[in-house]
């Protein structure tokens, strides 16, 4: 009951406090003597975009890749968990994780990379909290602004600027599909690393 939940939750971070903070370090811009921008060094964080700013096929492409049932579960998807278990048993190893988009956001925002039962339960508890606090569209918006998409780019705006030199609001269907294809392995599939492989994933 409550005691079991308390045991799992006692050392969890305060999600409201974490979301209110922004500890992301901006890229450093190297400029020439005449003031012209030469290059950026470090991670790139784009301007925050709202869901309404984006063409609909961008979030659609992401959900088709990451969480097709996003709008039909409360943060944790029992059907996805069962499907992952069956797939892993058939494969004889871990092939699918069963985590929803909300769980991925909870893990990326609040938790360490530690892979234990305790962390998995905390991930689920935080996913339920996010769903209750923000709702689907806001969760998707936060995810789109925070997700790592390779080449030091965090968020769809930064990724669009890094790879295509345009804003996320100007993304076309192919570019949206290419960004969605980066989610599985951002560094491996980044267009800056292997353009053909990235296009094949789109």
Model-derived segments and their meaning:
Residues 21-53:
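Short extracytoplasmic
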Residues 93-202:
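Non-catalytic, structured segments within soluble enzyme domains
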Residues 13-17, 42-51, 64-65, 124-125:
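N-terminal post-signal-peptidase region of extra-cytosolic proteins
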Residues 32-36, 55, 59-60, 131, ...:
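Conserved SET/PR-domain catalytic core that frames the SAM/AdoMet-binding pocket
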Residues 35, 67-68, 145:
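Alpha-to-beta junction loops
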Residues 38-47, 63, 87, 184-187:
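Acidic/histidine-rich, surface-exposed loop or edge segments in extracytoplasmic proteins
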Residues 1-31, 69, 89:
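N-terminal type II signal-anchor transmembrane helix
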Residues 22, 50-101, 154-164, 171:
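Flexible, acidic/glycine-enriched loop-and-adjacent beta/alpha segments
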């Amino acid at each position: 009951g409550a005691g079991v939940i308390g045991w799992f939750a006692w050392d969890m971070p305060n999600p409201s406090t974490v979301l209110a903070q922004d500890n992301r370090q901006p890229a450093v811009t190297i400029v020439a003597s005449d003031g012209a921008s030469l290059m950026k060094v470090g991670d790139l964080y784009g301007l925050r975009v709202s869901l309404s700013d984006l063409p609909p096929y961008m979030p659609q492409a992401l959900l088709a890749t990451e969480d097709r049932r996003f709008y039909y579960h409360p943060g944790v998807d029992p059907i996805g968990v069962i499907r992952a278990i069956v797939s892993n048993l058939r494969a004889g190893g871990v092939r699918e994780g069963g985590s929803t988009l909300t769980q991925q956001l909870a893990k990326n925002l609040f938790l360490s990379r530690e892979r234990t039962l305790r962390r998995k339960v905390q991930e689920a508890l935080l996913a339920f909290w996010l769903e209750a606090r923000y709702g689907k569209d806001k969760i998707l918006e936060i995810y789109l602004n925070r997700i790592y998409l390779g080449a030091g780019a965090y968020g769809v705006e930064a990724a669009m600027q890094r790879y295509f030199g345009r804003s996320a609001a100007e993304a076309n269907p192919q570019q949206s599909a290419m960004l969605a294809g980066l989610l599985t392995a951002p560094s491996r599939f980044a267009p800056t690393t292997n353009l053909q492989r990235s296009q094949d994933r789109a």
